[in-house]
UniProtKB/Swiss-Prot annotation:
Coiled coil: none annotated. One of its GO terms (biological process) is L-methionine biosynthetic process from homoserine via O-succinyl-L-homoserine and cystathionine. Substrate binds at residues 163, 192, 249. It catalyses: L-homoserine + acetyl-CoA = O-acetyl-L-homoserine + CoA. SUPFAM superfamilies: Class I glutamine amidotransferase-like (SSF52317). This is Homoserine O-acetyltransferase. HAMAP family: MetA_acyltransf (MF_00295). Pathway: Amino-acid biosynthesis; L-methionine biosynthesis via de novo pathway; O-acetyl-L-homoserine from L-homoserine: step 1/1. Transfers an acetyl group from acetyl-CoA to L-homoserine, forming acetyl-L-homoserine.
Length: 306
């Protein structure tokens, strides 16, 4: 979908240079169709980078997508210019009377903390509760997925002995499932986390199903059977160099971290990482937008309800 974003947003230039179709407001108004309204609750520290990654995957298909960027009020990002936040972001209080076709809740580097100890936890739970009646399909990513499973289903996270970091092979559990339609028998997805959720906990919830998993990385995609809530345990949105940048950051902090698996050529951190998940990621995000959102959301957005 051509994505409707402000011309001044850094992602506009980045995506245009990649030959991805982006649309400014004036052009969007000349198309007599209802755009999909997608909100992004961006909890990542480097918000501009996360914007670029997610908007890239929401772009370049036949329909319009109108994006609203949301930041938390209870915690102000220390890694994104305040001018950028003031210009392009809004607060939940400003949009909570609206309805959206989709919501993306990103990951955040807070997974080793207890959920209730996180500064913005109360605000996040208010948003997740609101999403049940104001969002048609909510996509939770990595820590956002763990937070969503904990809030909605009381599914805990467990600390791993060693951080999972790398690009891992996955399989599809149901080849007829809409979210995984078109994926190869074996496909790759990056993971980067210190915690996990367990299969036996998810299997106790009849409303949930595990659509994809990995021998090395564990569960990847969990979804409600009606697709109103989707949970990605990995990071299909990551760019080629994101895992590298995270590894170098952790090493500079003095953390005892291993080189991301199946990523660098011959484990040489000076090499250009292998980008082996771009195709599968495009399919996964496209499937969410098409099958979980566009094909089922009501034409009158005000009809969205729990």
């Amino acid at each position: 979908m051509p994505i409707k974003i402000p011309t001044e947003l850094p992602a506009f230039k980045v995506l245009s240079n990649e030959n991805i179709f982006v649309m400014n407001d004036s052009r969007a108004k000349t198309q007599d169709i209802r755009p999909l309204k997608i909100a992004i609750l961006n909890l990542m520290p480097k918000k501009i980078l996360a914007e670029n990654q997610l908007l890239r995957h929401l772009s370049n298909t036949p329909l319009q997508v109108e994006v609203k960027l949301i930041q938390t009020k209870s915690y102000v990002s220390q890694n994104t210019p305040i001018e950028h936040l003031e210009k392009f972001y809004t607060y939940f209080d400003d949009i909570k009377e609206e309805k959206f076709d989709g919501l993306i809740i990103t990951g955040a580097p807070v997974e080793q903390m207890e959920f209730e100890d996180i500064t913005y936890w109360n605000e996040l739970t208010e948003i997740m509760e609101w999403s049940k009646s104001n969002i048609f399909s909510t996509l939770h990513i990595c820590w956002g997925a763990q937070a969503g499973l904990y809030y909605h289903y009381n599914i805990p996270k467990y600390k791993l002995e060693n951080k999972i970091s790398g690009v891992f092979s996955h399989w599809v559990n149901d080849e007829n499932a809409d979210l995984t339609r078109g994926l190869d028998d074996v496909f790759h997805v990056p993971h980067s986390r210190h915690t996990e959720v367990k299969k036996e906990d998810i299997n106790k919830i009849s409303e949930l199903e595990i659509l994809s998993e990995s021998k090395e990385a564990g569960i990847f995609i969990v979804a409600t059977k009606n697709r109103r809530k989707i949970f990605f345990m990995g990071h299909p949105e990551y760019d080629r160099n994101t895992l590298k940048e995270e590894y170098l950051r952790d090493r500079e902090k003095g953390d005892d971290v291993e080189i991301p698996q199946n990523y660098f050529v011959d484990n040489d951190i000076n090499s250009t990482p292998k980008f082996t998940w771009r195709g599968s990621s495009n399919i996964i995000f496209g499937n969410w937008l098409n099958y979980c959102v566009y094909q089922n959301t009501p034409y009158d957005i005000n009809e969205i309800s729990e």
